[in-house]
């Protein structure tokens, strides 16, 4: 199992022209995440995405260190990004090739240099996710659920050790949200899941409640979700 460590991490952002030169997006946070499935929950704008993005270097700490399996994200960014897959809320941002098969092929470019073998491997990936019939379709003609599944298939095809998913079910209908949720929770990889779906959070092994740029509760999902519900209802 993987290990994600945050050592006194602070994230600040400049606010050009704003009343204050810098805002704190994440207050000093120290975490040691070794559980298989870690949920990040909390209100809009609380800092969940920021926390999730720190894990693969999409957000850099202003101070402190993020370490994934012993690799400092700031120093070994490329190596970390090969081990840490990322799935966004809106899969469109990560589907960049004209057709479904080409998109999976792009994900596989580091693993298989030979074009034909890569296309074959891409077809196998699609088949294993039930997407074989869509191979030659434009990604823009897919439904939201198909697109999210394709984005996930592309990332998982690279066999990452950790998967970070930032609200991956938010745009999906109930059936697709359940399908993607079940898939994520069944992965062998360590999962960091930022989500507003508290039922999904409850099925994780650990939950962190983020509020106003700080982790305010951390522990068993049932307790953390109960705490969130109690505080959210005022
Ligand atoms: N680069 C930046 N510059 C200024 N402010 C930022 C920057 N990135 C994030 N923020 C702010 O930091 C706060 C936390 O944002 P973040 O996206 O991490 O929240 P979130 O919990 O994922 O929200 P949501 O549930 O709405 O997706 C928000 O107020 C956001 O506007």
Language-model region placement:
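Conserved ABC ATPase signature
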Residues: 138-142, 146
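Conserved ABC transporter NBD signature motif
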Residues: 64-75, 80
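Conserved beta-strand-loop-alpha-helix hinge in the C-terminal portion
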Residues: 214-234
């Amino acid at each position: 199992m993987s290990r994600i460590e945050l050592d006194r991490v602070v994230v600040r952002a400049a606010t050009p022209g704003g009343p204050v030169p810098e805002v704190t997006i994440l207050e000093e946070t120290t975490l040691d995440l070794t559980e298989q499935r870690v949920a990040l929950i909390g209100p809009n704008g609380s800092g969940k995405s920021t926390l999730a993005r720190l894990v693969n270097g999409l957000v850099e700490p202003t101070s402190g260190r993020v370490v994934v399996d012993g690799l400092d994200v700031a120093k070994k960014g490329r190596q970390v990004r090969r081990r840490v897959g990322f799935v966004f809320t809106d899969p469109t941002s990560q589907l960049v090739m004209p057709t479904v098969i080409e998109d999976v092929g792009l994900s596989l470019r580091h693993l298989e240099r030979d074009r034909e073998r890569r296309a074959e491997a891409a077809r196998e990936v699609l088949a294993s996710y039930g997407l074989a019939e869509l191979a030659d379709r434009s990604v823009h003609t897919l439904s939201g659920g198909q697109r999210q599944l394709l984005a996930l298939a592309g990332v998982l095809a690279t066999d990452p050790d950790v998967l970070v998913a930032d609200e991956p079910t938010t745009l999906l209908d109930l059936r697709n949200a359940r399908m993607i949720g079940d898939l994520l929770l069944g992965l062998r990889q360590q999962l960091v899941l930022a989500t507003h779906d508290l039922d999904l959070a409850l099925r994780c092994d650990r939950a962190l409640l983020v509020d106003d740029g700080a982790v305010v509760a951390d522990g068993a999902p049932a307790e953390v979700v109960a705490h969130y519900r109690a505080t959210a209802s005022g």
